[in-house]
Amino acid sequence: MINPRPKIPFTQILDALLDNAQPFPPQYLYRFSDLQPADQEALGAVWTKIETQRRINLLEDLEDLLESDTVLLFDEISQLALKDPEAQVRTVAVRLQAENPKESRARVFMCMAEKDSDEFVRAAAVSSLGQYVYLGELDKISPETLHLVEDKLFDIVNGQDTDLVRRRALESVGFCSREETVPLIEKAYQHKDTGWVASALFAMGRSMDSRWEKEVMGNLNSPDPELSFEAIRAAGKMEIQAARLRLLKMLASYDELDEDVRGAVIWSLSEIGGEGVRKKLEGLLEQLDDDDEIEYLEEALENLEFTEDFKLAGMFDLETLKNAELDTVIDLEHARLEDDEPLSWEDDEYNGADEEDEE
């Protein structure tokens, strides 16, 4: 079989990077995935000799490539770029590192979130820590690491850093189930700065907590585009059924919507599902002629199918549970008729079965 990606000598890659007179060939990008130690060392030797904007462009191109090919890993080059003297390079490097959130990296991000000299790098590091809160809630990282990350984020939200960094910290703790999270979100939502309100809505969506439904619904049609956008996204993440008709109504003015808002409405509908959603999205798909919009809508329809299947499975599980409970009641009644003795709720066999169900 012919290899669709022939191995290009890494010296050729480095020469191309250093050649400012020519655009960097996009077909070379994949060579930065899983760098061998020798190649990593060679890249490190010339890294700061590469023009700054070229380094930034390279990392951003690698970031874009990850969206279409998730098998690739750019750990080595992003690790190198974390120590770059240019803040913009470090910012993109943090985002690249966060694509593969190893538990050992949490401490690196915590350190950068606190000590990096640039506000945007700190903000990127704080945002990356949100993934560790999410993983911790799923028991995918150790409780010790989770608590360290949560404590660091709470310290930053309540600290003296810039509003941007503190807002990103609030968004990251949106995943957190600790009781300290709720008052922080409430305080941010009451802030006079709409940036804080937007971050509060973002955190509400991540929490998936129905307590915030009123606040989210109240901002779906906000005159502030940022607040409306975040409320639309939060409605989808929280699967707020009451938002379905209002989001469908928004799609009736598809061409008038901002591109980002349009995308948020479509995706949130795919997360909420329900009557009329599939028909609306499929009808919209037939009207589109832009390839990117078509691809996005097709992905939304795939997600809608997942949503529908999940809800259908939940209905079957509920029906199975109800039938099982009914069978248990019938069996108990038969037992009473056969034994002519009332069953005690203190019966050892019943209690044991109940404990197994709870486990």
State what each model feature region is.
Residues 21, 50-51, 85-86, 117-118, ...:
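Short inter-helical turns and helix N-cap capping residues of alpha-solenoid HEAT/ARM repeat scaffolds
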Residues 1-70, 324-359:
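N-terminal alpha-helical scaffold/docking segments in eukaryotic complex subunits
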Residues 15-35, 45-48, 56-69, 80, ...:
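Structural detector for internal amphipathic alpha-helices that build alpha-solenoid repeat scaffolds
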Residues 282-359:
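Eukaryotic acidic, Ser/Thr-rich intrinsically disordered low-complexity regions
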Residues 90, 94, 112, 117, ...:
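A broadly tuned "polar low-complexity/structure-edge" signature
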Residues 84, 153-155, 196-197, 293:
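Short, mixed-charge aromatic SLiMs
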Residues 2-12, 35-47, 68-83, 102-115, ...:
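Amphipathic alpha-helical scaffolding segments comprising HEAT/armadillo-like alpha-solenoid repeats
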